[in-house]
């Protein structure tokens, strides 16, 4: 079941949870989508600023499996 998050802080809090398994990063010409797979929900975050997206990518937890999609 997908849920969309609007705040970067909320996304980072969810990414640090124990049940967070993986994060898929999907880049488009106009935005970047972060899809976080947890045990119950798939959380999505859409960022239109590419600099903020790069910062968020670097600040993801090191134990989280990150996969970049085209």
Swiss-Prot record:
The UniProt keyword set, sorted, is:
Ribonucleoprotein, Ribosomal protein
Entry GO terms, CC:
cytosolic large ribosomal subunit
Q: Which family does it belong to?
A: Belongs to the eukaryotic ribosomal protein eL38 family.
Q: Does the keyword Ribosomal protein apply?
A: yes
TM spans (from-to): none
Q: Which Pfam families match?
A: Ribosomal_L38e
Q: List the disulfide bonds.
A: none
Identify the domain of life: Eukaryota
According to UniProt, the name of this protein is Large ribosomal subunit protein eL38
Q: Which GO terms describe its biological process?
A: protein-RNA complex assembly; translation
For whether the record's keyword set contains Lyase, the answer is no
Query: What are the recorded GO MF terms, alphabetically?
Result: structural constituent of ribosome
Region forming the signal peptide: none
